Each structure stands twice: as C-alpha cells, then as structure tokens.
C-alpha cells in the first residue's frame, strides 16, 4: 500500500514539474511528393504540455474527412506527442495544412509539395 501511495505521489510531482510548452510540429509525406500519385499526409506534434491539443488536416481550407490519429502518448519527461495522418493524392495547386490548436492558440503548418 505504501509503495502505491509513493508511486502516485511521484507521478503527481512529475506532472506538476512539467511547464506549459508549445508543440513542435513536423509536416511531411510518407513517400516523396509527386502530383497525381497516392501518398500519406502526416502531421507529427511533439514536446508539448499540457496534453490538451487539437490537430486538423485541411485541403484548400476545408477539413479532410477520414483522418486517423494515434493515441496521445508521453515521454519520460511528461511532454506529449501525437500524430495525425490521411491518405491523399495531391494535385497541382492543392493547398494542404496541418492546423494545431494548443492552449487556445492556433497555428497553420503548410505541406509544401513540388518545391
């Protein structure tokens, strides 16, 4: 019983030591980008705290349906990471954005294709 209480207190202490930190965002594709070829649009968000976060994948300003998201996970330092992705076939002039909202602030991260 004492070990359980110590473990719980240690977990609470570690959580209280983590400070508010904005996410690092990486936007990329599974394969090299090529217009007209199926691929995966991936947005990986890491190193953030607190864990409340929203990731939205957009094409030409509209939310892309059928996206998939990993389970929220954390590292030993109590900072979190998460990945959202979707299959897509890019066409010239398409605009793809990963919009990340954390602590009430939204920021758009663009997927650059053909550059």
Curated annotation (Swiss-Prot):
Question: Signal peptide span per the entry?
Answer: 1-18
Please name the InterPro entries in this protein's record.
Ig-like_dom, Ig-like_dom_sf, Ig-like_fold, Ig/MHC_CS, Ig_C1-set, MHC/Immunoglobulin
Q: Which UniProt keywords apply?
A: Immunity, Immunoglobulin domain, MHC I, Secreted, Signal
Q: Which SUPFAM superfamilies match?
A: Immunoglobulin
Ig-like C1-type domain: from which residue to which, for each copy? 23-114
Where found?
A: Secreted
| GO CC, one annotated term | MHC class I protein complex
Gene3D superfamilies xrefs: Immunoglobulins
Q: Name one Pfam family in it.
A: C1-set
Q: Output the GO biological process annotations, alphabetical, semicolon-separated.
A: antigen processing and presentation of peptide antigen via MHC class I
**Mostly located where?**
secreted
Function noted in UniProt: Component of the class I major histocompatibility complex (MHC). Involved in the presentation of peptide antigens to the immune system.
Relate the assembly described in the record: Heterodimer of an alpha chain and a beta chain. Beta-2-microglobulin is the beta-chain of major histocompatibility complex class I molecules.
Family, per entry: Belongs to the beta-2-microglobulin family.
* Protein name as annotated: Beta-2-microglobulin
Q: Which organism is it from?
A: Paralichthys olivaceus (Bastard halibut)
Q: What is the lineage of its organism?
A: Eukaryota, Metazoa, Chordata, Craniata, Vertebrata
**What gene name is listed for this protein?**
b2m
